[in-house]
Amino acid sequence: FKALKVNENRVQRWCQKVREPMLEKIRKMPTHLTMEQLKQQWYEGTDESRMHYSWTRYYALNLHSVFYRGTLEWRCFESTLHAGKVRANITLALAISAQAINQKKTVMRKTGISENPAFTFRTFLLRLGLIGPEYKNVRAHLMENLPGDKAWRYDKTMYPSNQHRENER
């Protein structure tokens, strides 16, 4: 949310973070999960898939739209007319969606945010496949709101190879 610079008021009302208990229940379900089973967990036992304004739609990843219309909706992006930022947001949504479709297995583990959020997020983007010069602007737009050095996890003077260079100066 920090990388996307989501307004805190929007997070509280329109694009809440994931419901952890629901996610844990889904993770414990059988490997070959059907859409009906997923729907049962998403709506917590009730079927609100025909209701346009279900309370479950106000999450960053809105699966209500999958059950209601057959489309996936990402609600975490702020409005903008900047073409580069629009491209970055679309590319991020497509990359995460593609990984979800193509990934053979998942491990439910939160990636800790290190003292250098820019480096942590950059490695996440690289794991998504946003590598190379064609994604340079996408990475730049997505990381512009994060503090830290995107190239080094820790202060670069801490690495032995860089200490040697500092001593030569």
Identify the role of each PLM range:
Residues F1-R169:
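C-terminal accessory/tail domains of diverse enzymes
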